Regions:
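Intrinsically disordered or highly flexible coil/loop and linker segments, enriched in small
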Residues: 23, 118, 166, 183, ...
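Long, charged, mostly alpha-helical binding arms that flank functional sites
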Residues: 253-330, 334
Length: 553
């Protein structure tokens, strides 16, 4: 039985089949086409298939659906393998390639031809659409080639394989039901001609099986019991079952569908994502603004937060739109516990402590992670000198109402160090403040003033002599429209790109303990958010997520 913590309509179906003895082993699969990078929507399919197999002590396969050679390639195969490894979704049932079944798919196609259940058609794509009618009431009519004899069809199909015909000149269609209200059952194409080299098979083949034909065959060969896929394939289920019944004569594999994961301000279409990459609108498939798993990984997302988000978004049969802020909130909750604290000044201005010795340097112990565990008292040493960097936004000559940080004559605490009072500023020829002067109360090291006076604000700082220079990239949503699935059909999705999806800050100042930080490390930059070193560009930090948001889990 399914774990109560992972119970949904899919586990109800599986529980019933197990109880009736219809299956002994729960065997699932994740079948990505290697023509693009996996995204957050793919993570839902991985999570469902992997977790269901794991909960029932079953098997989980990874199968590359490489039956359409036009855009497929090894680059995508390797990225998919990396993504599953990152997610710790181990395919304990094995790793397979749909192209390894080409010979068997071909043999099954010949079987259907011999049984009078498939025929070679000469109609063009446009003519076929006309003949098939539509689901709005236009009836279909049979192709003039529908009644070819099995012998003639077999000869033509073998000549298709031999390369005698051009792309689109002929197709192999299943002979099912032209009167069906389901368009997928009106003699669907199951083989087409494509004189395109395959990334694994080379030029061995010039005919390729359609997904709806190859997929159920592959499932049956691998012993899949539950073929779990997204809701767009619901109308394809009768064809899936037709293939299984006519070629294998059994009930299983069983296809069932779940709703896709849609996230606000995001597109999931590979076509759209590819266009963003190919037109250099983004910095590759792993741009931190992209919804791809490689982009989320580069952004700093954790694999555990991805699966937690997918689980909390729910598994149902009804499409819904999940707020991106829920995805961020899940990650933020994890990072709040696990990310080490560090100090970084993103938009620096110099603070000079006039009464502090120029040749002196002392070290303050700052906590690494005060929120992780009450017993976690680990600290690191941070250098303090006469000249410091503070945030430009932490000082105002003429402060706005309720401003609690540094102004002329006011006093603040330098986090973990001294109280300082602003005494003046230096300006350039344009009147811009280039340095702030202050005096420290040197009796307040790590403590409160003896006279008990209250200080309203605390600001962070980095020593000018002991810091690292960095570029910081602050990310926002990639699209301005919340529901990108609702834009008009004739609209250009690129018109909805957010012009402010990234803000680049040059010259940020980081505490020197970050010199050994590497991609994959995650830090809370105190008061500024969560950040990680970029995996492509040295000296660049990506903001993973902000410190706070109004969204509540």
């Amino acid at each position: 039985m399914a774990d109560e913590k992972f119970s949904n309509f899919l586990t109800d179906i599986i529980d019933a089949d197990l109880a009736e003895g219809k299956v002994d082993v729960v065997h699932t699969r994740f079948p990505p086409e290697p023509n693009g990078y996996l995204h957050i929507g793919s993570a839902k399919a991985i999570f469902i298939n992997y977790t269901i197999a794991k909960h029932y002590g079953g098997l989980f396969n990874l199968r590359f659906d490489d039956t359409n050679p036009a855009r497929e390639g090894d680059e995508y195969v390797q990225s998919i393998l990396q993504d599953l490894k990152w997610l710790s979704a181990e395919p304990n049932g094995g790793i397979f390639y749909g192209s390894d079944y080409f010979e068997r798919c071909y043999a099954y196609a010949e079987q259907l031809i011999k049984e009078g259940k498939a025929y070679v058609d000469d109609l063009t794509r446009e003519e076929m659409q006309e003949y098939r009618g539509n689901d709005a009431g236009k009836p279909s009519r049979p192709s003039p080639y529908r009644d070819r004899t099995p012998e003639e069809n077999l000869d033509l199909f073998r000549r298709m394989r031999a390369g005698e015909f051009a792309d689109g000149e002929k197709t192999l269609r299943a002979k099912i039901d032209l009167a069906s209200p389901n368009m997928n059952m009106r003699d669907p194409t199951i083989y087409r001609i494509k004189h395109v080299e395959h990334h694994r098979q080379g030029d061995k083949w010039c005919i390729y099986p359609m997904y709806d034909f190859a997929h159920p065959i592959q499932d049956a060969i691998e012993g899949i019991t539950f073929s779990l896929c997204s809701l767009e394939f619901e109308n394809h289920r009768p064809l899936y079952e037709w293939v299984i019944t006519n070629l294998f004569g059994k009930e299983f594999p069983k296809q069932r569908e779940f709703a896709r994961l849609n996230v606000t301000n995001t597109v999931m279409s590979k076509r759209y994502l590819r266009e963003l990459v190919e037109k250099n609108i983004v910095d590759g498939w792993d741009d931190p603004r992209m919804p791809t798993l490689s982009g989320l990984r580069r952004r700093g997302y954790t694999p555990t937060s991805i699966f937690t988000f997918v689980k909390e978004a729910g598994i149902s049969q009804a499409d819904n739109l999940v707020d991106m802020r829920q995805q961020e909130a899940v990650l933020r909750a994890e990072l709040e516990l696990n990310a080490q604290r560090r100090v970084a000044v993103l938009e620096p201005v110099k603070l000079i402590i006039d009464n502090y010795p120029a040749d002196q340097c002392e070290y303050f112990d700052l906590p690494n992670n005060p929120n992780r565990d009450a017993n976690d008292t680990t600290t690191r040493k941070v250098a303090f000198t006469k000249e410091l960097w503070i945030e430009n936004s932490d000082f105002f000559e003429v402060p706005p109402p309720k401003f609690k940080r540094l102004t002329l004559g006011s006093e603040v605490r330098l986090m973990g160090a001294y109280l300082v009072r602003c005494t003046g500023v230096d300006k350039d020829e344009n009147g811009k403040v280039v340095a702030i002067h202050a005096e420290a109360d040197l009796e307040t090291r790590n403590g409160n003033p003896a006279d008990g006076r209250k200080v309203r604000g605390t600001i962070h700082w980095v020593s000018c002599a002991h810091c690292l220079d960095a570029e910081v990239e602050l990310y926002d949503k990639l699209f301005t429209e919340a529901n990108m699935n609702s834009i008009p059909d004739d609209a250009d999705f690129k018109d909805y790109l957010n012009p402010d999806s990234v803000k680049v800050l040059q010259g940020a100042k980081l505490e020197e303990s970050l010199k050994d930080a590497k991609p994959g490390d995650r830090f809370q930059f105190v008061r500024n958010g969560y950040f990680t070193p970029d995996s492509k560009h040295e000296g660049v930090y990506n903001r993973i997520v902000t410190l706070k948001d109004s969204f509540k889990l």
